């Protein structure tokens, strides 16, 4: 008794209070059912005549109920029982409700339960909501009292000794049997517990008070807790029966709420928020005729059961992570207002809606990013707003975005207006106070909106946001192309974007030509800007002198010079020193236009840039003909050209040097060309040989497969023929002694095995001799 009393006072009460403080529902009677010995043993003491071994009890030990309340086995039992109850409740439709459990420390002696029959009558009179079952219940209790166990049924949850303690063994056994049958039938201890019925009577009393002010919805909600007690014909026990009207009322309420939600927020197919019909919602859920607690109890338990098409939990986690990164501080009065009961009622009365409304649960970042949300998201009418709030906007009214840097995807949408409306950010009181700064206001400035635009472009077009800064820096250049643009996974799209940007910002034709050339060549390791600019500078399209390339000479950047090798467009050779722009002769004549170029003049055009030093010296020596003629003319024509002019020795020496160097460079180019041709031819030959080898290997595999199949067929035929042969006595020949020999003329001969082996060895020797 000492340990049991200590368990009641220290263990169970303290543990239950702690669980109730953190919001966990605790039913002490269910634990008392299985964890403790039956109450008759507590009251009367244990007796070997009627004590049964509870082999289902997890806390049983060899010496009885001797486990200390602080034992570690209790945690395992509590967890196992809780999980088992959850598993058993999977097939039932449960509507979550909010229950407040009050623990009575000091009990009034007048309200205590005694074992007499008048106390049962008091319990029935005080239990509002059980009036319909008073007659049958009273009959059952009277019959139980006549049998001598009515008091046990009424005072099953009490720990006081009964007045009439003269129970016999048969009565106690009958009580035990009936109690176990109640447990098997699903009737818990709360049916006969006076404290439980007292709680229900208090709830019914509150509901009846609200029914006096309410309407049809409120009256229907009050009938949910009414119970009818039916009598089981087999056991004689009374248990609550489900009233058909209650189930119909619950089902109709749920269907009506779902229908209202579907009509108000059709998220299934529409991509934008339509205008909500608030009048329907206000008529279905009147607020003036019922307190705020009843609104939350009717709407809040039913609305979470509807499945939203969006992952609301993930969206809210993303939003909270953004808030934590920006280190925002929201006023404590806002949190107190949202989570305090009194201020929550004020908020509910102001907006005619429960705090956890479907609007707050169905707002997602995806829907917030739509373009026309601000026009269609009129979820609340003017009558919902409180007059005390002044000129503030509705609960979820979207404000137009004041930023101009956002693209069309995020236009006319204010995220802060969606998730943190002004009504929630301000302190909720009867006077209109100043609004708090928007928690997400710092996130949607000009710089962040530009970054969002770039991120949207990166998602849709494969644009690399890292190149944005490079493009901005290179808008003033002649081409607008970055040197490392080929490293992007979407180099083609980035080049197109840069070409369009540069061509729109530049007035010269060099940007368009370089961009088109870059788009045709693809992702390369160098920029061909200087080459194309030099072409058009010679044509007169650009009025400034371009710089030379710092990476490779221009004469080796033209793909037309190596048209036979497609991938050598990106390979450049640098065999000479770079020349500064100032070393060029300012009086150099302009080359003819692109349309008048011939195939013979193209090589000389590139060689002029390579031989700028020789050109300079030739102009200084006043040589009457160009370097193109000096290098490209045949020997006879070259000699005739020299004979036409009277040239000095210095001029002749310079002409010969120019011709020799030009011929050497052309020969070197031809040599490199021949080497590359040879390498390419060898590579092609190797590839052809590899293809032939693979083809021969496949044919060999096919031949081996055919030979294997033929051998298998010959072996099967050999066995079939050998099996049909018979000797003089009609007996088959033994395959160990005889074998079939194939003659050259196609006949088959039966010979002994030894002779066949000798012939086979001879054949092998002949084959070896032939190989040698």
Swiss-Prot record:
SMART domains tied to this protein: BRLZ
All copies of domain bZIP, residue ranges: 654-717
GO MF entries: DNA-binding transcription factor activity, RNA polymerase II-specific; lipid binding; RNA polymerase II cis-regulatory region sequence-specific DNA binding
Pfam family, one: bZIP_Maf
PROSITE patterns documented for this protein: BZIP (PS50217), BZIP_BASIC (PS00036)
Biased composition (Basic and acidic residues): 198-216, 598-613
GO biological process: cholesterol metabolic process; regulation of transcription by RNA polymerase II
Entry keyword annotation includes Secreted: no
Protein name in UniProt: Endoplasmic reticulum membrane sensor NFE2L1
């Amino acid at each position: 008794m000492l340990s049991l009393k200590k368990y009641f006072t220290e263990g169970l009460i303290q543990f239950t209070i702690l669980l109730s403080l953190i919001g966990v529902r605790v039913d002490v009677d269910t634990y008392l059912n299985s964890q403790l010995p039956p109450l008759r043993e507590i009251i009367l003491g244990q007796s070997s005549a009627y004590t049964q071994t509870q082999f289902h009890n997890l806390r049983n030990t060899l010496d009885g109920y001797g486990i200390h309340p602080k034992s570690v086995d209790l945690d395992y039992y509590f967890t196992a029982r809780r999980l088992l109850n959850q598993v058993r409740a999977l097939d039932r439709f449960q509507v979550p409700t909010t229950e407040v459990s009050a623990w009575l420390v000091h009990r009034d002696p007048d309200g205590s339960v005694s074992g007499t029959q008048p106390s049962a009558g008091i319990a029935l009179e005080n239990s509002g909501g059980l009036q319909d079952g008073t007659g049958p219940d009273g009959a059952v209790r009277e019959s139980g009292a006549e049998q001598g166990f009515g008091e046990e049924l009424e005072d099953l949850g009490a720990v006081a000794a009964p007045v009439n303690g003269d129970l016999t063994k048969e009565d106690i056994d009958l009580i035990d049997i009936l109690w176990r049958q109640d447990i098997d039938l699903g009737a818990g201890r709360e049916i006969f517990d006076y404290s439980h019925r007292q709680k229900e009577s208090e709830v019914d009393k509150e509901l009846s008070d609200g029914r006096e002010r309410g309407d049809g919805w409120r009256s229907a909600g009050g009938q949910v807790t009414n119970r009818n007690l039916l009598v089981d014909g087999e056991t004689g026990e009374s248990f609550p029966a489900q009233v058909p009207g209650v189930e119909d009322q619950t089902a109709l309420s749920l269907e009506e709420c779902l229908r209202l939600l579907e009509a108000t927020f059709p998220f299934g197919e529409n991509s934008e928020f339509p205008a909500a019909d608030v009048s329907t919602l206000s008529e279905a859920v009147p607020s003036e005729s019922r307190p705020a607690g009843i609104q939350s109890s009717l709407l809040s338990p039913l609305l979470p059961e509807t499945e939203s098409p969006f992952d609301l939990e993930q969206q809210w986690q993303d939003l909270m992570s953004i808030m934590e990164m920006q280190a925002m501080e929201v006023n404590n009065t806002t949190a107190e207002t949202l989570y305090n009961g009194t201020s929550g009622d004020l908020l509910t009365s102001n907006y005619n809606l429960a705090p956890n409304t479907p609007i707050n649960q169905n707002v997602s970042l995806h829907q917030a990013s739509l373009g026309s949300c601000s026009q269609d998201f009129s979820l609340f009418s003017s009558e919902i707003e409180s007059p005390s709030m002044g000129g503030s906007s509705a609960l979820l009214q979207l404000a137009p975005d004041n930023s101009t840097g956002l693209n069309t995807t995020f236009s006319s949408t204010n995220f802060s207006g969606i998730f943190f409306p002004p009504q929630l950010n301000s302190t909720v009181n009867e006077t209109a106070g100043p609004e708090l700064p928007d928690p997400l206001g710092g996130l949607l400035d000009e710089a962040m909106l530009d970054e969002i635009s770039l991120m949207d472009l990166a998602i849709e077009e494969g644009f690399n946001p890292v190149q944005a800064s490079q493009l901005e820096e290179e808008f003033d250049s002649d081409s607008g192309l970055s040197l490392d643009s080929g490293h992007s996974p979407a180099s083609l799209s980035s080049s197109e974007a840069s070409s369009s940007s540069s061509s729109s910002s530049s007035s010269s034709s060099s940007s368009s030509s370089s961009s088109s050339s870059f788009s045709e060549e693809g992702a390369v390791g160098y920029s061909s800007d200087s080459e194309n600019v030099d072409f058009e500078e010679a044509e007169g399209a650009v009025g400034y002198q371009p710089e030379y390339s710092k990476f490779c000479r221009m004469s080796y950047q033209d793909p037309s010079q190596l048209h036979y090798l497609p991938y050598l467009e990106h390979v450049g050779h640098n065999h000479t020193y770079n020349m500064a722009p100032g070393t060029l002769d300012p009086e150099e004549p302009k080359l003819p236009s692109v349309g008048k170029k011939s195939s013979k003049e193209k090589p000389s055009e590139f060689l002029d840039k390579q031989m700028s030093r020789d050109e300079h010296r030739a102009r200084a020596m006043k040589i009457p003909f160009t370097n193109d003629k000096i290098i490209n003319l045949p020997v006879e024509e070259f000699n005739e050209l020299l004979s036409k002019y009277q040239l000095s020795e210095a001029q002749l020496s310079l002409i010969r040097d120019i011709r020799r160097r030009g011929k050497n460079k052309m020969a070197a180019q031809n040599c490199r060309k021949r080497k590359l041709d040879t390498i390419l031819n060898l590579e092609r030959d190797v590839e052809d040989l590899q293809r032939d080898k693979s083809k021969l290997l496949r044919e060999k595999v096919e031949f081996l497969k055919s030979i294997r199949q033929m051998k298998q067929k010959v072996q099967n035929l050999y066995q079939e023929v050998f099996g049909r042969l018979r000797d003089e006595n009609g007996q088959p020949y033994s395959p160990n002694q005889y074998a079939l020999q194939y003659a050259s003329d196609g006949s088959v001969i039966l010979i002994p095995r030894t002779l066949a082996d000798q012939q086979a060895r001879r054949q092998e020797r002949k084959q070896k001799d032939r190989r040698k």
